[in-house]
């Protein structure tokens, strides 16, 4: 993994004609809602921590005018190459870095940017990654059991985890990240199967998980039995929750007053992390409820702009069924000493802790 500008990454510069066409036709999820949340302004500096195929970034560039700039990050060199092509009309005002979004500060520092006016992350696996069998994210087409978003980084492929982890580790991963009630049966089935030879392909793993499920579960389930296992392994391989936590730890310090943060998630675990973090950062107190008087001295740093997560409209779902699980949450950075919106007093909270009008985000 490198924090260098993408021009130093040769893999990103070499993309297929089919990939370039996919980038041109790509319509990003919740596009109108993201633009409303970020409210890009002319001349602003913005961060897209997961540029992907560049759809959100292109829409941002259209709104920030000739003096605006955008910093684009992605850990997938293929995606970066496609994004460079899509965003080429804006030339040097778009800056590309091959890095994890959690490491965004190194990119901003290289650009000499202290703060930005808005930041967006759209986390999880992309449609392009799912559809490329050789990436190993999906069981719909057979391919190597890889699942790495950055194949040039230091992450180990999913095959290593599947073939080396103990039954307890596998069970914990599938239960924690996949929330699969059959986690124990699946973990044991994987360990038993690999005793006969390594598990190297997505089809092999999907078949093992399918057999581990009771017949009545397979008959009544709306999804393939391997769906949650594949999700869990992908999240573990790419440290997806850890990346999100580290990003949220630092991003508010790099937002200008009035700057906006928008986060799109596709999994309840991710959404829960974002929800709770924005809720805490919008409060003047984060002491435990057992404390009768505020002792933490915490000051509200954001206004939460989305009381509930924003989801796709029926019209968008008709165009893109993969948007069905997308959730957008957004917040606006408060200036030092700026009071948040009027807040409702919570009589059960310690003195000094209130809730936003309309309830906690």
UniProtKB/Swiss-Prot annotation:
Which GO biological process annotations does it have?
rRNA base methylation
Show the GO cellular component annotation of the record.
cytoplasm
Per UniProt, where does S-adenosyl-L-methionine bind? 54-56, 74, 101, 122, 129
> S-adenosyl-L-methionine as a keyword?
yes
Q: Which domain of life is it from?
A: Bacteria
Q: Name one Pfam family in it.
A: Methyltransf_5
Q: Entry's Gene3D superfamilies?
A: Putative methyltransferase TM0872, insert domain, Vaccinia Virus protein VP39
Keyword Metal-binding carried by entry = no
Annotated stretches, region: Disordered = 318-361
Q: What GO molecular functions are on record for this protein?
A: rRNA (cytosine-N4-)-methyltransferase activity
Q: Which reaction does it catalyse?
A: cytidine(1402) in 16S rRNA + S-adenosyl-L-methionine = N(4)-methylcytidine(1402) in 16S rRNA + S-adenosyl-L-homocysteine + H(+)
Q: Which residues form a coiled coil?
A: none
Q: Where in the cell is it found?
A: Cytoplasm
Biased segments, Basic and acidic residues type: 348-361
- What InterPro entries does the record point to? RsmH (IPR002903), SAM-dep_MeTrfase_MraW_recog (IPR023397), SAM-dependent_MTases_sf (IPR029063)
Q: Which SUPFAM superfamilies match?
A: Putative methyltransferase TM0872, insert domain (SSF81799), S-adenosyl-L-methionine-dependent methyltransferases (SSF53335)
- Record EC number: 2.1.1.199
Return the protein name: Ribosomal RNA small subunit methyltransferase H
**Source taxonomy:** Bacteria, Pseudomonadati, Thermodesulfobacteriota, Desulfovibrionia, Desulfovibrionales
């Amino acid at each position: 993994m490198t924090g260098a500008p993408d021009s130093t990454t040769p893999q990103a510069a070499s993309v297929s004609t089919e990939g370039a066409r996919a980038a041109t036709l790509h319509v990003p999820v919740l596009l109108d809602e993201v633009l409303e949340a970020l409210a890009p302004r002319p001349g602003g500096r913005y961060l897209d921590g997961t540029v992907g195929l560049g759809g959100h970034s292109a829409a941002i560039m259209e709104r920030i005018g000739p003096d605006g700039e955008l910093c684009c990050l992605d850990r997938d060199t293929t995606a970066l190459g496609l994004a460079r092509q899509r965003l080429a009309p804006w030339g040097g005002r778009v800056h590309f870095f091959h890095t994890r979004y959690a490491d965004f500060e190194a990119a901003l520092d290289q650009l000499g940017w202290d703060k930005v006016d808005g930041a967006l992350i759209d986390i999880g696996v992309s449609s392009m990654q799912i559809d490329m069998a050789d990436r190993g994210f999906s069981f719909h087409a057979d391919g190597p059991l890889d699942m790495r978003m950055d194949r040039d980084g230091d992450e180990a492929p999913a095959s290593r985890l599947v073939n080396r982890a103990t039954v307890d580790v596998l069970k914990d991963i599938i239960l924690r990240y996949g929330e699969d009630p059959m986690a124990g049966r699946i973990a044991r089935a994987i360990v038993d199967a690999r005793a006969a030879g390594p598990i190297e392909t997505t089809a092999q793993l999907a078949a093992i998980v399918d057999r581990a499920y009771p017949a009545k579960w397979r008959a009544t389930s709306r999804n393939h039995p391997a769906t949650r296992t594949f999700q869990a392994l992908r999240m573990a391989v790419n440290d997806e929750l850890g990346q999100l936590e580290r990003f949220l730890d630092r991003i508010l310090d790099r937002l200008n007053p009035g700057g906006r943060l928008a986060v799109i998630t596709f999994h309840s675990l991710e959404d829960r992390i974002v929800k709770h973090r924005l809720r805490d950062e919008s409060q003047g107190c984060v002491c435990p409820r057992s404390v009768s008087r505020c002792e933490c001295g915490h000051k509200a740093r954001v206004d939460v702009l989305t009381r509930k997560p924003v989801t796709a409209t029926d019209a968008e779902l008709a165009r893109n069924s993969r948007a069905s699980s997308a959730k957008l949450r957004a917040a606006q950075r408060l200036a030092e000493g700026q009071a948040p919106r009027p807040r409702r007093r919570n009589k059960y909270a310690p003195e000094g802790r209130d809730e936003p009008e309309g309830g906690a985000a």
